[in-house]
Amino acid sequence: MDAKLEELSFTYFPENYRWSHGLLIGLNMAPWGGAEIGEVNRVGLRLRNRVGDDDAWFREWAREARTVEDRGRERIAEGYTTSGAQYLHRASAYYHVGERFLQPKSKEGLDAYMRGVACFRDAAKYVKRPRMEHVEIPYDGTSLPAVYVHAEPANASGKVPAVVFFDGLDVTKEIQYFKGVADLVARGIACLIVDGPGNGESIRFRNLYLRPDTEHYATPVFDYLAARPEVDA
């Protein structure tokens, strides 16, 4: 990294920009419930002497994710569904941050990825606000998995605006949720977060590869939104 840039950047692992950026993805989800700084730091400390070992990165994030997931499921079983859902949200994010560096994707990695998806889905059952739905958007004879997050409060006198999020290279819809979606829905803007071709579930389990003509898969996404009665299309 350029020396001047390094002075301006928070680099948890100064010798490895990629790992520092990956850990920052974890830390940056904290304001929206996707991480707890102490938990992320605990993972970072365990990795200090193994910088660059992507298998170790995966194992330590998965270890933390499983610990947090177990606590969340225990809370839910005890009737503390709000705190349980918070744990599951963080576990979902940790599973996905840990899996992102695995190339090629292994069965172990795909299993961890799906645990993250399951944690997010299970948390949604207990989160009353913002209200969200897991939806499937018809596309090329199959569908794109997505999360629709309702505007809060709903506009009783009219329709609401909406924003679409498509994932980046190695981001998932579950991670994207913890990147400010709650702030938008609190301002009365609905959000649709999509695992498009080449991302998330679409590439891992549906063989939908990245393509350059974004309009090909964006069009059915916007058609889906336009068909929702509460959206101002």
What is each residue range found by the language model?
Residues 59-61, 65-68, 111-158:
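N-terminal cap/lid segment of alpha/beta-hydrolase-fold proteins
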Residues 169-182:
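The serine-hydrolase catalytic nucleophile loop
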Residues 183-201:
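Conserved alpha/beta-hydrolase
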Residues 59-70, 85, 89-98:
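Amphipathic alpha-helical repeat scaffolds of TPR domains
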Residues 160, 165-172:
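Active-site glycine-rich loops that stabilize anionic/oxyanionic intermediates
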Residues 208-233:
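Alpha/beta-hydrolase active-site loop
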Residues 29-42, 92-135:
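An N-terminal hydrophobic leader/cap segment in hydrolases
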